[in-house]
C-alpha cells in the first residue's frame, strides 16, 4: 500500500456519456480534457486532509487499482487535483463506498480556491443526494431524496458547473439543478467525511466550450 500526496495524470481526449437531454438547459460542447490515472502514485495533487492511498480494489478499471481514502478520524477528507482553475466544467468520477459507521460517502469538490469550494456528495447511509458550499463551515444549497448508493458497489458522480448553474448526477440520473454565484472558478478534488473509507476511479475533467 502506498500513501500518496502526488499523482500522475494523463491529458487526452474524453467525452462524457451522461445524457444532457434529460433536463432543460443549454447545449454543451466539450471534448478535450484531463483523464486522471488513479491507479498510480499521485503527482501534483494537494492533500488537504485524510490518508489517500493507491491500492487494489475489486472492479477498479485500471489493473484493479484505485485511489482510496482511509482516514477515519477527520471531520472531512479532501484531496485536490492538479490543473485548473476551471470555471465552466464537467467532472465525472466513479466511487465505491467501502465502509463506515458514521458516514459512507463519496463526493466531488469543484471551484476549490483558498479552502472554499462546492461539493456534491452521495452517502450509502443516507437517502439523500446533496450540494453544499464550504466557506469557513458547511452550508447546504440543495438536496433530493434518493435510494442510497449500495455499500461495496461502484457508482458514478458527475457535476456540470456553467456560470452560476450547477447540476449533479448520480448513476447517470440528474438529481440536482441549482443556481449559485458564490464561487466563480477553482480546482477539482475528491471528498469523504468522518470514517468513510471510499475508493475513487476514472476521474475526468472536461472544460466546457461556450
Language model features with spans:
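Ligand-recognition surfaces built from glycine- and aromatic
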Residues: 185-210
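Short, solvent-exposed beta-strand-to-loop segments that form ligand-recognition rims
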Residues: 171-189
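Secretory/extracellular carbohydrate-interaction modules
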Residues: 71-130
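Short carbohydrate-recognition loop motifs
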Residues: 57-77
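Extracellular carbohydrate-recognition regions
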Residues: 30-49
